[in-house]
């Protein structure tokens, strides 16, 4: 654990990975100063509420559903895309809620998920070596836009403001209405080739809604049935953006990163002695850490010591991302070592990043079956070790893209090019995401019955 006094800027004294170099240092400082003058995107009290919800997840009184785009885009920003994402998250949540008889904590990868880590600093584009694309908040995807520009942080902030405004409206309006969301699911079951597999759950939800209405419960007049809590999250990768959005809460005198309710550290930046861990140890938001197949028990426990030294329940989420072929070998030993130490940890699964492959044409994709297999293994391993599979973390979209192969739509390698729009990694489309939710619902129900 670092013995240095923490401040929003103390990370500058630590080694940093996956960070851009800006040529114009004066412009960088000007942009950061302007960002610091802007209102917070979220409030400290909301982040505390989320921590309380995540504490309930650890106590097996709720389940975490975290999902959204691989990377948000300036050019593809639209109200319809936000609506479609929110809609499919609500559809997934109602299925999981009913199957598990448990509240679902809904956290979007949205309103700030602009930066992406890259394996290499440069790449070849049109036979020319250029800087790698690191997300719209840093540089552009075209060859002429590869130089990092500080002013992109301002555009990311303003787009996040607009996104949050729309999400808050959806969460308090008709799009979160329980009856309306269930109608969306009925359409999915009706129009899906494998609909019969999910018909039983859909029928039982219909019966439950009918029973409530027969008892005089009017959904339109019952806030708990037409409004939802929806929280935001992103990877805290670009610390030049995160630092100026830190605020000291007037009620608790504690620091919060007000760019999102929840933040996470990626597999490439989780060095306990690195800048990203140093920055996040000092803010009181709930924190996630991606845990890959090579993580050791000692590394994970050191991260727990640095990021959650007081073992606060709901503070720390370990997001396992090992791949369907590796998780059965690596996760049991890791769980055994960490569970001995009695840490309050929310364990969730990211079944996307460990299952990325390239087709014969060099196109990045993920197989739905591999994603599903890793989720299944995650639940099975937790059961065997006497622990809880407490959440799922997905890269997904509400659109009808063709980026991941398989699922009930039987997307093939040959059909990927039909609607392949991602600027970074392949995402589950709306149908695949909802299909996965129905399948996870069965696992959650079984876990709850134990």
Q: Where are the regions a protein language model picked out?
A:
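Non-transmembrane, aqueous-exposed alpha-helical and coiled segments at domain scale
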Residues: 300-303, 307-309, 315-346, 353-402
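Glycine-rich, charged/polar anion/phosphate-binding loops
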Residues: 49-51, 273-276, 332-334
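Short loop/turn segments at strand-loop or loop-helix junctions that form parts
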Residues: 65-70, 107-110, 349-352, 395-397
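Active-site-facing alpha/beta catalytic cores
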Residues: 71-72, 76-323, 366, 391-393, ...
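A general structural signal for short secondary-structure junctions and capping/turn motifs
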Residues: 54-57, 95-97, 279-280, 381-384
């Amino acid at each position: 654990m670092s013995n240095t006094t923490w401040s929003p800027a103390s990370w500058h004294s630590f080694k940093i990975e996956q960070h851009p170099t800006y040529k114009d240092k004066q412009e960088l400082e000007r942009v950061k100063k302007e960002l610091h003058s802007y209102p917070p995107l979220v409030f400290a009290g909301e982040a505390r509420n989320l921590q309380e919800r995540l504490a309930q997840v650890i106590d097996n009184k709720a389940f975490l559903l975290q999902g959204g785009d691989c990377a948000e885009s300036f050019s593809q920003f639209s109200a319809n895309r936000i609506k479609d994402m929110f809609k499919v998250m609500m559809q997934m949540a109602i299925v999981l809620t009913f199957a598990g008889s448990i509240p679902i904590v809904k956290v979007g990868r949205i309103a700030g998920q602009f930066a992406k880590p890259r394996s290499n600093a440069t790449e070849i584009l049109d036979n020319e070596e250029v800087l790698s694309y690191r997300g719209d908040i840093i540089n552009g995807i075209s060859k002429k836009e590869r130089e990092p520009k500080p002013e992109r942080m301002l555009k990311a902030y303003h787009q996040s403001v607009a996104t949050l405004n729309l999400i808050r409206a959806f969460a308090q309006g008709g799009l979160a209405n329980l009856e309306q969301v269930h109608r969306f699911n009925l359409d999915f079951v009706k129009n899906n080739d494998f609909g019969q597999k999910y018909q039983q759950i859909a029928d039982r939800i219909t019966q439950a809604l009918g029973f409530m209405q027969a008892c005089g419960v009017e959904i339109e007049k019952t806030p708990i049935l037409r409004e939802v809590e929806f929280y935001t999250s992103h990877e805290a990768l670009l610390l030049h953006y995160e630092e100026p959005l830190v605020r000291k809460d007037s009620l608790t005198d504690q620091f919060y990163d007000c760019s999102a309710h929840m933040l996470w550290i990626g597999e490439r930046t989780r060095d306990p002695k690195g800048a990203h861990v140093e920055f996040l140890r000092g803010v009181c938001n709930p924190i996630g850490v991606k845990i890959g197949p090579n993580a050791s028990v000692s590394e994970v426990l050191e991260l727990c010591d640095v990021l959650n030294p007081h073992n606060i329940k709901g503070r720390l989420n370990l997001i396992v991302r090992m791949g369907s072929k590796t998780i059965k070998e690596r996760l049991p030993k890791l769980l055994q070592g960490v569970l001995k130490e009695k840490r309050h940890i929310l364990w969730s699964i990211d079944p996307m990043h460990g299952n990325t492959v390239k087709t014969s044409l060099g196109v990045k994709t993920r197989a739905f079956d591999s994603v599903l297999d890793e989720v299944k293994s995650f639940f099975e391993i937790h059961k065997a070790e006497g622990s809880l599979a407490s959440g799922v973390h997905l890269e997904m979209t509400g659109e009808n893209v063709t980026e991941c192969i398989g699922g009930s739509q039987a997307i093939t390698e040959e059909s990927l090019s039909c609607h392949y729009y991602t600027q970074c990694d392949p995402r589950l489309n709306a149908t695949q995401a909802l299909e996965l939710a129905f399948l996870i619902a069965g696992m959650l129900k079984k876990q709850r019955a134990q």
